[in-house]
Amino acid sequence: MASALSAGLIGKRCAASDVLVIVPGEAVRQRSQDQGTHTAAGVTPQLAQQRIWILAVKPQQMKEVLLQCQPYVKDDTLIISVAAGIAAQSIAKWLAVNGKPHNRIIRAMPNTPAFIGCGATGLMALAAVEPNDKLIAETVFKTVGEFVWVDNDQAIDAVTAL
């Protein structure tokens, strides 16, 4: 999904040099580099320079990845998670700084047709997410199809059935 999102962003919304893709897999990383995107094999201090993080991580890897990312999160960092079944409150807790959860979290659940730009994505935001953050998420997910905002974590997973 990270490949589909970065390709959509680069093709429609921003320059490849403005995107940092962290991908452990060499083949996917090479495809991103071929598009001109900045890439890294793992969490890097460069992450602290990015205000928007899109985490397209396998659910079983999410906690470990977030704990590695936690030192680089700032108050204004917008986290967009594309990991099935990982509650927004869990993400907020794993990114906590000094015991304070990081609540600028948007969950996104695109369905499979997003890979070809014809998908439907469910979006859900915690209360601390600002209106402009929602517009950013909408801009990202318009690149791979339609989107719909839902009210809670339970409703978001139903969107993948569309």
List PLM regions with ranges:
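NAD(P)+-binding Rossmann beta1-loop-alpha1 motif at the extreme N-terminus of oxidoreductases
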Residues: M1-G42
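Internal alpha-helical scaffold of NAD(P)-dependent oxidoreductase catalytic cores
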Residues: S90, W94-R104, A120-A158
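Rossmann-like NAD(P)(H) cofactor-binding subdomain of soluble oxidoreductases
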Residues: E26, Q35, G42-L123
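Short conserved AdoMet
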Residues: C14-A15, K74, K100, K142
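Residue-level "edge-of-site" marker
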Residues: I22, P45, D153-A155
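Phosphate- and divalent-cation-binding pockets in alpha/beta enzyme and binding domains
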Residues: A4, R31, E64-V65, S90, ...
